From Swiss-Prot:
Function: Dolichyl pyrophosphate Glc1Man9GlcNAc2 alpha-1,3-glucosyltransferase that operates in the biosynthetic pathway of dolichol-linked oligosaccharides, the glycan precursors employed in protein asparagine (N)-glycosylation. The assembly of dolichol-linked oligosaccharides begins on the cytosolic side of the endoplasmic reticulum membrane and finishes in its lumen. The sequential addition of sugars to dolichol pyrophosphate produces dolichol-linked oligosaccharides containing fourteen sugars, including two GlcNAcs, nine mannoses and three glucoses.
GO biological process terms on file: dolichol-linked oligosaccharide biosynthetic process; protein N-linked glycosylation
Membrane topology: Multi-pass membrane protein
Chief localisation class: endoplasmic reticulum
Residue segments, region Disordered: 1-30
Organism superkingdom: Eukaryota
UniProt name for this protein: Dolichyl pyrophosphate Glc1Man9GlcNAc2 alpha-1,3-glucosyltransferase
Organism, scientific name: Candida albicans (strain SC5314 / ATCC MYA-2876) (Yeast)
Pfam families: Alg6_Alg8
Lineage, highest ranks first: Eukaryota, Fungi, Dikarya, Ascomycota, Saccharomycotina
Cellular location(s): Endoplasmic reticulum membrane
Lumenal side: 1-41, 161-169, 242-274, 322-378, 437-443, 488-518, 579-587
Gene (name only): ALG8
Pathway(s) the chain acts in: Protein modification; protein glycosylation
Primary enzyme class: transferase
Gene Ontology, cellular component aspect: endoplasmic reticulum membrane
Length: 587
C-alpha cells in the first residue's frame, strides 16, 4: 500500500527505551507558539487604543448636567465627613448613588491635582463654576475607570473554551468595547457606565465558569455601585439559588423531612450568604446612622411615570395613544360618546390647555392621562414582576449559563418596558447581556438587530448639540454596519427551523424571510426618522411656528424606537420559551 504524502509539518518523534514514541521539545515549542499566536490574535488592545483616540477628541465637546453632578459628588466626598455625604444639599445635585460609588468618588477626589482643585473642581456650591482643567480631569477619570470593562471583555474571550467560541466572543466583546451607547452616554453626555458594565460582565463570566461565589460577589459589588442593577437581581438570585444552593435528590431510605432538609446545600448557602452580607456591611455599615436618608436618596418615589424624554417603552406608546385620543375627541364629534363610555374620563379636563402641554412630558411629579386610565407605581411593579417571573421559571428548571444570560436579558427587557420612571439609558441593561448570546444562533440576529438599532438610536436626543450631531450619527451607523456583517460571519447556523416562529432566521431563509425583510425595512425607515427630526431641530429657530411643536421630534423618536424594542422583546421571548436548541450547553 502506498504511503500517504505528508501535507504539512509533522510532529517530530524519537524512540524511547520502552519502544514508545516520544514528542520532542521542538513539537511542544511549535504547539505553544501556535496557541500563543491564536490567543494574541483575539486581543482587544488595538480596539482599546483606537477607541481611546476618539474619546480624547471628545474631551472638549458637549457635556450634560450629569458632569456637574459628578463634580459636586467629588466635592462632597472630599470636603465633608462620611456622615454628611447623604445629607448635604447645597446643590440640587445631591449624592444619590449607593456607597461604593461614593467611595469611588472619594478616591477620585484624592487624585485631583492642585491646579484642578483651584479651578473649582472641589467647591461645594449651588452652581458649579469650573473650566477646562476640571473638564479634562473628569473626562480622564471616565477613560481610566473603563479599564474595568476592557479587562472583563478580554477575560471573556480568554476563558472561552474553543477557538470557534473565542472567535464568536471576540466579535461580541469588540462590539461592546466600541458600543455607541457608551460613547454617547459616558464620553459625551458624561457618566461612568463602562466601569459598571465591566463588573456586570465579570459576574456573567463567573457564571459561565461555574464560579458561583465569584458571581455572587461581583453582583453584590455592582449593586453597591449602582442600584439600577436591582432589575437584574431576580435572575442572579434564581441562578445562584438553583445552581449552587439547591440539590434535588430524593433518598427513598430517608423520611420526608430529612429529604426536604437535604434539598438545601447548607454549606454552600452559608458561604454565598456570608460573601453577599459582608459586601453590603462594608458598603452600608459606615452609614448606619443615616440609613433612612440614604434609602430616601436611592429610591425617590415622587417622580412621574415617564422621564422628560419618554424612554422608548410601553408607556411611551401608552402616552402617545392618550395624545392621539385627545385629538380624536376634539376633532371628531362622533367619537365623544364612545370614548366617554369606554374610558369614563372627565371631559372638562381637556379644556385646560396648559395642563395638556405638560401633563405627559415626564416632569417630576405625578403624571396624569386625560382619556386613558392613569398608571400607578404598583401596576408597573406588578407588570415588571410578572414578566420577570415568567423568564425565571425556565431558569429554575434548567439553571445553565445560556438560560441565565437569557433570563438576565428578559429581566432587563421587563424592567425597561414596564418600569416606573425609566431612563432611556437603561436600554444598555438589555443590550449588554444579549450581545453575549447573539452569535449563539442565527435566529437571535433578528431581535438583536432591532434592539441595537432602536436602542442606540433612541439615545440620539440625549446629544442635541449641532457640533456632536455628526459624531453620534456617523459613529453609530458605522458601528452598526461593521458588526451587522461581522456577526453574520461568526454566528452559528440554526440547528432547527421553526416555521412561523414569530421572527426571522437572521439569514433571510426559511419561514422567516418575510419578517426578516420587514425588520430590515423598519430599520432602514429609522433613517427617515433621523432626517426628519434633524431638519426639525435645524429649522425650529428660523420658523417660530415650529417651536409650538417642541416635543414632537422627541415623541417621534420615543414611539418609533418603542415599537422596534417591543418587537425585539416579542421575538426574543419566542426563542427563549419555544426554541430549546439555542439554550443547550454545547460549545
Amino acid at each position: 500500500m502506498a504511503k500517504k504524502k505528508s501535507t504539512g509539518p509533522q510532529p517530530s518523534l524519537s524512540s524511547s527505551p520502552n519502544g514508545r514514541a516520544k514528542v520532542t521539545a521542538e513539537t511542544i515549542t511549535t504547539t505553544t507558539t501556535t496557541t500563543t499566536d491564536t490567543t494574541n490574535s483575539y486581543s482587544l488592545l488595538n480596539i482599546w487604543v483606537i477607541s481611546l483616540a476618539l474619546k480624547i477628541l471628545l474631551f472638549i465637546g458637549y457635556h450634560s448636567t450629569d458632569f456637574d453632578v459628578h463634580r459636586n459628588w467629588l466635592a462632597i466626598t472630599n470636603k465633608l465627613p462620611i456622615s454628611q455625604w447623604y445629607i448635604e444639599n447645597t446643590s440640587q445635585w445631591t449624592l444619590d448613588y449607593p456607597p461604593f460609588f461614593a467611595y469611588f468618588e472619594y478616591l477620585l477626589s484624592l487624585l485631583v491635582p492642585r491646579f484642578v482643585a483651584n479651578d473649582g473642581c472641589l467647591d461645594i456650591v449651588e452652581i458649579g463654576q469650573y473650566g477646562l482643567p476640571t473638564i479634562y480631569f473628569q473626562r480622564l477619570t471616565v477613560i481610566i475607570s473603563e479599564l474595568v470593562l476592557f479587562y472583563a471583555l478580554q477575560t471573556i474571550v480568554k476563558t472561552s473554551p474553543t477557538l470557534s467560541a473565542k472567535r464568536r466572543m471576540y466579535v461580541a466583546t469588540a462590539s461592546l468595547a466600541l458600543s455607541p451607547g457608551l460613547i454617547l452616554i459616558d464620553h459625551i453626555h458624561f457618566q461612568y457606565n463602562g466601569m459598571m458594565y465591566g463588573i456586570l460582565l465579570l459576574c456573567i463570566n463567573s457564571a459561565r465558569l461555574q464560579q458561583y461565589l465569584s458571581c455572587g460577589f461581583w453582583f453584590s459589588v455592582l449593586l453597591c455601585f449602582k442600584h439600577i442593577y436591582l432589575y437584574l437581581a431576580p435572575a442572579v438570585f434564581i441562578f445562584l439559588l438553583r445552581g449552587y444552593c439547591l440539590k434535588f435528590y430524593w433518598n427513598k431510605r430517608k423520611n420526608f423531612f430529612i429529604n426536604i432538609f437535604n434539598f438545601i446545600q447548607w454549606i454552600n448557602l452559608f458561604k454565598l450568604g456570608s460573601i453577599v452580607i459582608l459586601v453590603f456591611i462594608i458598603a452600608f455599615g459606615p452609614f448606619y446612622n443615616v440609613l433612612p436618608q440614604l434609602i430616601s436618596r436611592l429610591f425617590p418615589f415622587s417622580r412621574g411615570l415617564t422621564h422628560a424624554y419618554w424612554a422608548p417603552n410601553i408607556w411611551a406608546v401608552y402616552s402617545f395613544l392618550d395624545r392621539i385620543l385627545i385629538q380624536i375627541y376634539k376633532k371628531i364629534p362622533m367619537s365623544k360618546y364612545p370614548l366617554l363610555k369606554i374610558f369614563q374620563f372627565d371631559p372638562n379636563s381637556l379644556n385646560n390647555d396648559q395642563l395638556l402641554k405638560t401633563s405627559t412630558r415626564g416632569i417630576v411629579g405625578d403624571i396624569e392621562f386625560f382619556i386613558l386610565p392613569n398608571i400607578t407605581p404598583k401596576l408597573t411593579f406588578l407588570l415588571t414582576l410578572f414578566y420577570q417571573i415568567m423568564a425565571l421559571i425556565p431558569l429554575f428548571i434548567q439553571p445553565t449559563y445560556r438560560r441565565f444570560v437569557g433570563a438576565l436579558t428578559l429581566c432587563g427587557y421587563a424592567s425597561f418596558l414596564f418600569g416606573w420612571h425609566v431612563h432611556e439609558k437603561a436600554i444598555l441593561l438589555v443590550i449588554f447581556p444579549m450581545t453575549l448570546l447573539v452569535a449563539r444562533d442565527q435566529k437571535l440576529l433578528t431581535p438583536f438587530n432591532l434592539l441595537v438599532s432602536c436602542g442606540y438610536g433612541s439615545l440620539f436626543p440625549l446629544i442635541f448639540t449641532c457640533n456632536e450631531w455628526l459624531i453620534k450619527v456617523v459613529y453609530t451607523y458605522t458601528w452598526y454596519i461593521i458588526f451587522y456583517f461581522n456577526f453574520r460571519k461568526v454566528v452559528r447556523p440554526s440547528k432547527n427551523n421553526i416555521i412561523g416562529n414569530g421572527i426571522g432566521n437572521g439569514n433571510g431563509k426559511g419561514g422567516g424571510i418575510i419578517l426578516d425583510r420587514m425588520v430590515n425595512l423598519y430599520i432602514l425607515l429609522f433613517n427617515v426618522v433621523v432626517i426628519i427630526t434633524s431638519l426639525f431641530d435645524l429649522f425650529k429657530h428660523k420658523y417660530p411656528v415650529l417651536q409650538n411643536f417642541e416635543f414632537l421630534n422627541l415623541m417621534i423618536y420615543s414611539v418609533y424606537c418603542a415599537i422596534g424594542i417591543i418587537s425585539s422583546w416579542n421575538g426574543f421571548c419566542w426563542l427563549y420559551f419555544i426554541d430549546d436548541g439555542i439554550w443547550n450547553q454545547d460549545q
